[in-house]
Amino acid sequence: MPELPEVETVKRGLAPAMEGARVAKLELRRGDLRFPFPDAFADRVSGRTIVSLGRRAKYLLVDLDDGNTLISHLGMSGSFRIEEGRIEEGAGAATPGEFHHARSKDEKHDHVVFHLESPAGPRRVVYNDPRRFGFMDMVGRADLAAHPFFRDLGPEPTGNELGAAYLAERFRHKAQPLKSALLDQKNIAGLGNIYVCEALWRAHLSPIRAAGTLATAGGRPKEQLNLLVASIRDVIADAITAGGSSLRDHIQTDGSLGYFQHSFSVYDREGQACRTPGCGGTVARIVQAGRSTFYCATCQK
């Protein structure tokens, strides 16, 4: 499933094509994805101008000129592609943030098509989703924070609200494993399995230690928590710069691949040498809450 850096890559890839464009027609080729589309969805979007694109956690946000926001989640296999001009079906397409194998480009999985008009000419932005785990919704922009998708989300990992003092208060007295606490979207929004593993390695913290051990009894952060916050920020920033992780043919708008996977220090490196200088340990894989965790037991304590 795409994590925050991959969704941010999608947003940045789509923005030049979609921002300022008018949706001449929203074409729905089926009645649902993971969930049914909102009532009169196509009619409510058609004719509107796209003001801006945004992101909250792992959700793509499309702000419209009538004060509504279209919400899109890519699920397991969703992707958008941009088709420039009046071109042959599938020709000349660019794919900003693709997280599945090339076989998934089969046009029978094209479920939503934005027919756009802009000064640069006509475009189509096509949503393709073979497994249909993605979904779309619509909400008034003023009500976005109260929407069920967002109302319980914690702060963004790169935002000013995230700090050691905040996490110390959230983790205080908790016996929950540290990795599980970091994956809890109520604590931090948008963090996923890959980048939690990488951030914990950078901070030299074990994924299985109790989250509460990083805070004092009075709820103050220990120094290790300051390092963890810095590591989270750094790993997310590095992944966004790299265009995300191409575990399954992730392609950016210009056709280039995300390459952060080449910088993985622990994720998917079971049995390989730890990259911490002088460590000498080996990356291990364990399962926590049904997910693979990769870490070095020698230097992560």
From Swiss-Prot:
Alphabetized PROSITE patterns for the sequence: FPG_CAT, ZF_FPG_1, ZF_FPG_2
Gene responsible for this protein: mutM
Co-factor(s): Zn(2+)
Pfam families for this protein: Fapy_DNA_glyco (PF01149), H2TH (PF06831), zf-FPG_IleRS (PF06827)
Enzyme Commission number: 3.2.2.23, 4.2.99.18
Quaternary data: Monomer.
Annotated GO biological process: base-excision repair
Active site: P2, E3, K58, R291
ZnF segments: FPG-type: 265-301
Molecular function via GO: 8-oxo-7,8-dihydroguanine DNA N-glycosylase activity; class I DNA-(apurinic or apyrimidinic site) endonuclease activity; damaged DNA binding; zinc ion binding
Cofactor: record remark: Binds 1 zinc ion per subunit.
Function according to Swiss-Prot or TrEMBL: Involved in base excision repair of DNA damaged by oxidation or by mutagenic agents. Acts as a DNA glycosylase that recognizes and removes damaged bases. Has a preference for oxidized purines, such as 7,8-dihydro-8-oxoguanine (8-oxoG). Has AP (apurinic/apyrimidinic) lyase activity and introduces nicks in the DNA strand. Cleaves the DNA backbone by beta-delta elimination to generate a single-strand break at the site of the removed base with both 3'- and 5'-phosphates.
Keyword flag Ligase: no
HAMAP family: Fapy_DNA_glycosyl
Positions with a binding annotation for DNA: H109, R131, K174
InterPro entries: DNA_glyclase/AP_lyase_DNA-bd, DNA_glyclase_Znf_dom_DNA_BS, Formamido-pyr_DNA_Glyclase, FPG_cat, MutM-like_N-ter, Ribosomal_uS13-like_H2TH, Znf_DNA_glyclase/AP_lyase, Znf_FPG/IleRS
Homology family: Belongs to the FPG family.
Keywords of this entry: DNA damage, DNA repair, DNA-binding, Glycosidase, Hydrolase, Lyase, Metal-binding, Multifunctional enzyme, Zinc, Zinc-finger
Organism annotation: Rhizobium leguminosarum bv. trifolii (strain WSM2304)
Reactions this protein catalyses: Hydrolysis of DNA containing ring-opened 7-methylguanine residues, releasing 2,6-diamino-4-hydroxy-5-(N-methyl)formamidopyrimidine; 2'-deoxyribonucleotide-(2'-deoxyribose 5'-phosphate)-2'-deoxyribonucleotide-DNA = a 3'-end 2'-deoxyribonucleotide-(2,3-dehydro-2,3-deoxyribose 5'-phosphate)-DNA + a 5'-end 5'-phospho-2'-deoxyribonucleoside-DNA + H(+)
Protein's name in the database: Formamidopyrimidine-DNA glycosylase
